[in-house]
Amino acid sequence: MMQQEQTFTIINKLGLHARAAAKFVTTAAEFQSDILVRRDGREVNGKSIMGVMMLAAAKGTEITVRADGNDADAALSAIGRLIDDYFGEGQ
C-alpha cells in the first residue's frame, strides 16, 4: 500500500463551493485509495461532499491531500489537475 501527500492552493475565484466540492468528490471517488483532505488542522474524507464543503476553502487557501492505496499517485495527480483547471470553471 502506498501513501502520498501533497499540498495544493485553491486558485478558483469561488473556492471549494458546492459545485467545485462535488467535482472534487467525484474525482476522488474514481480511485480505490482513501483520500483525506486537511486544512488548518481539520481533516475530512475527500470522498464526502459534506466533509469537503465543511473545509470552507476559499480562494488562496492551502489544503493538504493524502491518498492511501495502490493508486495514490494517480489520485493525487487527478486531483491536482482538477484544482489547476479551476475545477473547470475557467477562473
Which residues fall in each region the model found?
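Generic detection of intrinsically disordered/low-complexity segments and helix-coil linkers/edges
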Residues: 2, 18, 25, 80-81
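C-terminal structural segments of small proteins and small subunits
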Residues: 58-91
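Intrinsic-disorder/low-complexity, polar/charged segments enriched in Ser/Thr/Lys/Arg/Asp/Glu/Gln
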Residues: 3-7, 62-64
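SAM-dependent methyltransferases
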Residues: 1-2, 91
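Compact, glycine-rich, soluble single-domain proteins
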Residues: 9-50, 54-59
